Design a protein with these regions (language model features):
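C-terminal cap of metal-dependent C-N hydrolases
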Residues: 8, 314-317, 367-423
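A glycine-rich helix N-cap at a beta->alpha junction
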Residues: 109-125
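Histidine/acidic residue-rich metal-binding segments in metalloenzymes
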Residues: 134-299
Length: 423
């Protein structure tokens, strides 16, 4: 099947240009002015919209196998397509945990059967994500994008050192959820003013940055390619910035909710509960500074769906995690590109170029490349209504917020997997 996108604003080589894109047999075969199309080509007029390379999210929870009442590979990847993502990396907190070849194959089978975007699984660092014994990294290495115990911090320094040594030998990234259990003390939101005023148990910032400091030292000693998940504190940003200055092979990520909301926005509602928690204004400002100076390499969603019942128990008792695949680009475009905090090119780098460089997944808008692309109207605004999500998860702090930037279509390998009625 041939499809030609006509009169489009195309994001290519770091800027927008007016061009046509011809897609044939799943690949881009021509980009330019007045592209000549064979007679059997389906022409799509793209007005008031921009074609981007399909975005890359290296931190999502698809929940399958094991927790299909929260999300499935199918619903999660449909949500990804609805948000403009062509590639997602799936975290290993599943049942069974992908900690060996057999359990990983169960996840891969479901991906092959159900995914409508490209899915790259993580392998677990430890058996059962228990932090006691190293998983079978050698057996999983050919099939996984990286290794992580996301959802849990690796408490043992010796196990983390061993994991880093093995990841370096295998040429794999180790992506760490940094959380010191000894400092949690039953906390579930940031230990700031809101927690004190409303008698909630708080999570101190050191529970995150303390493990990052440990891991950065280990990465420097082992030479491991180290990636820090969902950075949320100002101290974490400072530690990573200094590590980069020393030449440590470290990258990091943060999410739209940490860049947008703070503890000042908290309500007694599970849609404001995630791990790590929403922090202070100073922490949020440090994250934005980290984006601007390159300390923070990429934006991810940490898309973590739960059932309606699990998120209806207030701040104290709700499950930790919010969804984000369907709002991520629009949230960042609205908060940072529209007001001139970030140029559009920087946002594309954070959501496509940088994760592609670091993790090796993603495609360019270029002749000969797979036709993985997304179409956004950057002038159209909408109010976030979670009941319209394609994800099974509905909990988001962006509910009711007006965002600008609507995904009109997503194409994967030349196949349209999401499309609004009109472009």
């Amino acid at each position: 099947m041939r499809i030609c996108f006509k009169h489009a604003q195309v994001w290519k080589d770091g800027s927008l240009r007016l061009a046509d894109i011809l897609v044939s047999d799943g690949r881009i075969v021509s980009i330019g002015d007045r592209v000549s199309c064979p007679t059997d080509t389906v022409c799509v007029e793209v007005h008031n919209a921009v074609i981007f390379p399909g975005f890359v999210d290296v931190h999502v929870h698809l929940r399958e196998p094991g927790f299909s009442y929260k999300e499935t590979v199918r619903t999660g990847t449909l949500a990804a397509a609805h948000g403009g993502f062509a590639h997602v990396a799936a975290m290993p907190n599943l049942n069974p945990v992908p900690d060996c070849k057999a359990s990983l194959e169960e996840e891969l089978r479901r991906i092959r059967e159900s995914a409508c975007v490209h899915v790259h699984p993580y392998g677990a660092i430890s058996v059962g994500q228990k932090g006691e014994q190293l998983a079978d990294l050698d057996a999983m290495a050919p099939e996984v994008i990286a290794f992580s115990d996301d959802g849990k911090g690796v408490q043992s320094e010796s196990l983390m050192r061993e994991a880093m040594e093995q990841c370096r030998r295998l040429g794999k990234i180790l992506a760490a959820h940094c959380e010191d259990n000894s400092l949690l003390r039953g906390g579930y939101i940031h230990d700031g003013a809101y927690a004190k005023t409303h008698s909630h148990r708080g999570i101190c910032s050191e529970s995150e940055w303390g493990q990052i400091a440990r891991d950065v030292r280990l990465a420097e000693e082992t030479g491991c390619a180290y990636h820090v998940c969902h950075v949320s504190t100002k101290e974490s940003v400072s530690i990573i910035r200094e590590a980069k200055r020393r030449g440590v092979n470290v990258t990091c990520e943060t999410g739209p909710h940490y860049l947008t909301f703070t503890e000042d926005d908290l309500q007694e509602d599970g849609r404001f509960k995630m791990n790590p928690p929403l922090r202070s204004r100073e922490d949020r400002d440090a994250l934005i500074e980290g984006l601007l100076d390159g300390t923070i390499d990429m934006i991810v969603t940490d898309h973590a769906p739960h059932s309606r019942e699990e998120k209806a128990r207030g701040l104290e008792k709700s499950a930790m995690g919010v969804v984000g695949l369907e709002t991520s680009f629009a949230a960042c475009y609205t908060s940072f590109v529209k007001p001139g905090v970030l140029p559009l090119g920087k946002l594309v780098d954070l959501m496509h170029d940088a994760p592609m460089r670091r993790f090796g997944c993603g495609t360019e808008l270029a002749i000969g490349q797979p036709a993985d692309l997304t179409v956004f109207n950057l002038s159209e605004s909408y109010v976030v209504e979670p009941e319209q999500f394609l994800s099974m998860g509905r909990a988001t702090p962006f509910a009711g917020v007006t965002l600008t930037g609507v995904c009109k279509m997503t194409m994967i390998d030349g196949k349209i997997v999401w499309k609004e009625e009109t472009l």
